[in-house]
Curated annotation (Swiss-Prot):
Keywords: Calcium, Disulfide bond, EGF-like domain, Repeat, Signal. This is Notch homolog 2 N-terminal-like protein R. It comes from Homo sapiens (Human). Residues 1-25 form the signal peptide. The keyword Transmembrane does not apply. The lineage of its organism: Eukaryota, Metazoa, Chordata, Craniata, Vertebrata. GO terms for molecular function: calcium ion binding.
Amino acid sequence: MPALRPALLWALLALWLCWAAPAHALQCRDGYEPCVNKGMCVTYHSGTGYCKCPEGFLGEYCQHRDPCEKNRCQNGGTCVAQAMLGKATCRCASGFTGEDCQYSTPHPCFVSRPCLNGGTCHMLSRDTYECTCQVGFTGKECQWTDACLSHLCANGSTCTTVANQFSCKCLTGFTGQKCETDVNECDIPGHCQHGGTCLNLPGSYQCQCLQGFTGQYCDRLYVPCAHSPCVNGGTCRQTGDFTFECNCLPETVRNKRNRALGKRQASLEWKRTR
């Protein structure tokens, strides 16, 4: 069999592609609607079809929202939709660059890329910028390692970074580089008055008062009925320098007796049923 010439092979290949293409292309048929989002299937003379999409949709089957519907391109940039992918890019006007055309060409964010260690540069004005640093870095240009990550401040204190150094702001009652040391307030005399004893606590202290005195610093005389210790309308009566008794309302006494009687009867009933 004689060998086929290259030109004939190309012609046969092209003919095959023409016949085979409709089998793989979009088909508009009765009872079959390939287009979504109210797209309309339109048939070519060759028998193949395409989806005519309504405003706001694109893609082979109108399956994508138009990414240019909300144009994010700044400074006069033009939004260019990639229909098959449902994505968009910005074609920037002269003098601007960036994914959204947000940078002027000579802006530091674009020219010198000042934000280090993966930081993101944000343009504040034509000549100024601000860096948003990745976790673990700090500084105007994210040039410092965040020392607070490796130096934890203790006892609820707050860590701040200055350059590549850390500083702990301690809560009252603690001291030390990392606020790890409890301040013993009892080392300073005079906290507790009238012979009260100072008891050191973590981050604080407490005064244990002598009989006859009360208050945070044992600075007030103890009056038994001063703080109205009796509840449910009872009346406090001082019986001594440091003692008192409560005179309860009759209804309160009766309720207590009834509750006690009820508990006793319930106990007897329970014993009878055993």
